[in-house]
């Protein structure tokens, strides 16, 4: 297990980011999706927790085979996805990632949002008070991102919001900028496979860090697109974008109808009703079936006639032990 705490500051308030993070997640997922790969939304519905109150539950499938390193692609199926389950009780969220193909792999993320510059060192005392962990600050303006994801229009050093007047962040902006908020993320990665654990857990944390950096940069760079939205408007945007994303990936309906299967209680999320099913059949596939009208191929005569022993001499057939030369014992 490898545990790290990430702190990402934003030139926003926590109340503003409630709309911004929903907008960013939907648009980012749509942009990163393509035919056969991307983020499929399986479930997105209100959810009530006895402790945290009202929230939103989402389940997604993240198809990412081409984004895996070569050493990982060699051991996973071609159609490979990670299941994401998230419980959003903003300003507190829980996100879990699992993979049925890799049962010993999981990512658990707890997120809390506060209006400060990442100065709360006790924010996760209830979750991991005595657990040793590395604290990593992510600077959306100054930290480098992978070159293939860089866009000047999404660079906080160059972008300036027309609606808020915020932007063109410079080194040290977190010390003086107002407003400012921080996303605190406690990330636990587990891959309990001997010989690969350290390598995989470190790799996953690198990917998580890159995604957090890119996503938070985009949330700010897109602020003029979502700043005036209401919650109802961003939920409608979310619904429409998710539908378009599923079509973009190429999600097809299940092979058989499963609508007659009773739904599980909302607290049980292990088998979503939209999971594809495989019809059971004892018949062989058509391409393996032998046509009934095909003539039987004869590779041998239907009857076998043996020679008459009495005619053996006249036919001049050799005996079983006959030989032109006498048999001689092998010399020792």
UniProtKB/Swiss-Prot annotation:
Question: Positions modified as Phosphoserine?
Answer: 119, 270, 274
Superkingdom per UniProt: Eukaryota
Q: Where is the composition biased (Low complexity)?
A: 267-285
Catalytic reaction equation(s): a 1,2-diacyl-sn-glycero-3-phospho-(1D-myo-inositol)(in) = a 1,2-diacyl-sn-glycero-3-phospho-(1D-myo-inositol)(out); a 1,2-diacyl-sn-glycero-3-phosphate(in) = a 1,2-diacyl-sn-glycero-3-phosphate(out)
Q: Which CDD domains match?
A: SRPBCC_PITPNC1_like
Q: Fetch the PANTHER family from UniProt.
A: CYTOPLASMIC PHOSPHATIDYLINOSITOL TRANSFER PROTEIN 1, PHOSPHATIDYLINOSITOL TRANSFER PROTEIN
> Under which name does UniProt file this protein?
Cytoplasmic phosphatidylinositol transfer protein 1
Q: What lineage does UniProt assign to this protein's organism?
A: Eukaryota, Metazoa, Chordata, Craniata, Vertebrata
């Amino acid at each position: 297990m490898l545990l790290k705490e990430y702190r990402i500051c934003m030139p926003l308030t926590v109340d503003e980011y409630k709309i911004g993070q929903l907008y960013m997640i939907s648009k980012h997922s749509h942009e990163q999706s393509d035919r056969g790969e991307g983020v499929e939304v399986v479930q997105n519905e209100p959810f009530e927790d006895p402790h945290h109150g009202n929230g939103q539950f989402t389940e997604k499938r993240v198809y990412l085979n081409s984004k895996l390193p070569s050493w990982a692609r060699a051991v996973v199926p071609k159609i490979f996805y990670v299941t994401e389950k998230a419980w959003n009780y903003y300003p507190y969220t829980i996100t879990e990632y699992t993979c049925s193909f890799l049962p010993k792999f999981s990512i658990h993320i707890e997120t809390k949002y506060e209006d400060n510059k990442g100065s709360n060192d006790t924010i996760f005392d209830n979750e991991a008070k005595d657990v040793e962990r590395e604290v990593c600050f992510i600077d959306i303006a100054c930290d480098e991102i992978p070159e293939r994801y860089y866009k000047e229009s999404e660079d906080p050093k160059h972008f300036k919001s027309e609606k808020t007047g915020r932007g063109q962040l410079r080194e040290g902006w977190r010390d003086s900028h107002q407003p400012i908020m921080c996303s605190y993320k406690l990330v636990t990665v587990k891959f309990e496979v001997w010989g690969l654990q350290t390598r995989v857990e470190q790799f996953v944390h690198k990917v998580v860090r890159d995604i957090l950096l890119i996503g938070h940069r985009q949330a700010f760079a897109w602020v003029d697109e979502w700043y005036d939205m209401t919650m109802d408007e961003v939920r409608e945007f979310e619904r429409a974008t998710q539908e378009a994303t599923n079509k973009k990936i190429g999600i097809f309906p299940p092979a058989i109808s499963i609508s007659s299967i009773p739904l599980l209680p909302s607290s049980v999320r292990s088998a979503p009703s939209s999971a594809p099913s495989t019809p059971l059949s004892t018949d062989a596939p058509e391409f393996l079936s032998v046509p009934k009208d095909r003539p039987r191929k004869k590779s041998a005569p239907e009857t076998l006639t043996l020679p008459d022993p009495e005619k053996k001499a006249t036919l001049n057939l050799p005996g079983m032990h006959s030989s032109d030369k006498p048999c001689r014992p092998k010399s020792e």
